[in-house]
């Protein structure tokens, strides 16, 4: 019932109603899932076993996109290749100092969509790529709502949470949201909270 909103705003906190579309957590902004990945820990999720922040985040993105849409392994592998290309275009690598990055320094989902669309338009069947033209088309169809369409208001944009010191997420409206949107939004919130706990604390 958003009973915490007035108190949160009174002390200078941020009340983020997830369904209002005002506040966004950029899913393409790398988040910290573990402060020391162990590749030999087979009981841990894949993202936790990666040793670098970017590798952890790309692994998280694979699960995030699965939560949003029933993509096949081939679709997810294609998205992973496209995400890696996008980060390379933006100069984001394993050696990037993420502590110096601002929210505006990261690509957003519409940038990813534009990249995939360009790859689709320029597809060369003689180039022997790892992905097919049909896969690109299906990925574009599956991601359109999140990147450009009705769901973009919840996912497409730079992170604009005004305070992580006192932050309340309003989830009431999510009860009536489509299951795939709800799952993806909660997954995204979890990544944001994990990152703040591991990098900032409190």
Task: Give the ranges of each region predicted by the language model.
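Glycine-rich phosphate-binding P-loop
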Residues: 1
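Rossmann-like S-adenosyl-L-methionine
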Residues: 4-5
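P-loop NTPase motor domains
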Residues: 9-14, 18, 23-202
